[in-house]
A protein has these predicted regions:
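Conserved small-domain helix->loop->beta segment predominantly found in fold-type I
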Residues: 1-32, 37-57, 112-116, 121-127
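PLP-dependent enzyme catalytic core of the Aspartate aminotransferase-like
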Residues: 50-127
């Protein structure tokens, strides 16, 4: 995690140097196959090391969508373990995908904004 030594992890976003396991573009596509959406992200030193925006050395994780759906610390740990199993353990993304879908099935209501009974991803009429 970039900036961890400076206390920069008190945000809903973290940037991770992923170069030990591949490039950010490849990791982004792998996680997407498992229904985990992250973004590839250039690191400050990527250009000097020959990387570009398609194959950067980093990935960016944000927790705002998970939080909006009501997930808390325990679910974040579970998501981190799913990501680890994909990237480090090289598990099948389709197997992980079913676990992601199962986890998300319990979180279908928007929290912390709008009415608490608003269904997630349902079109909201703005008047």
């Amino acid at each position: 995690v970039l900036g961890a030594n400076n206390g920069f992890t008190e945000s809903h976003i973290i940037i991770i140097d992923i170069t030990k396991f591949g490039d950010g573009g490849t990791i982004e596509k792998l996680l997407e196959k498992a229904n985990i959406i992250i973004n590839r992200n250039l690191l400050p030193y990527d250009i000097k090391q020959g990387r570009n925006y398609l194959t950067p050395g980093g990935i960016r994780l944000g927790s705002q969508e998970c939080t909006r759906l009501g997930m808390k610390e325990q679910e974040m740990i579970e998501i981190a373990n799913l990501i680890k199993r994909l990237i480090i353990n090289n598990e099948n993304p389709l197997k992980i995908r079913s676990e992601v879908n199962e986890l998300k099935s319990s979180f279908q209501t928007i929290n912390y904004c709008f009415k608490s009974n608003t269904k997630a991803y349902e079109y909201i009429n703005i008047q």
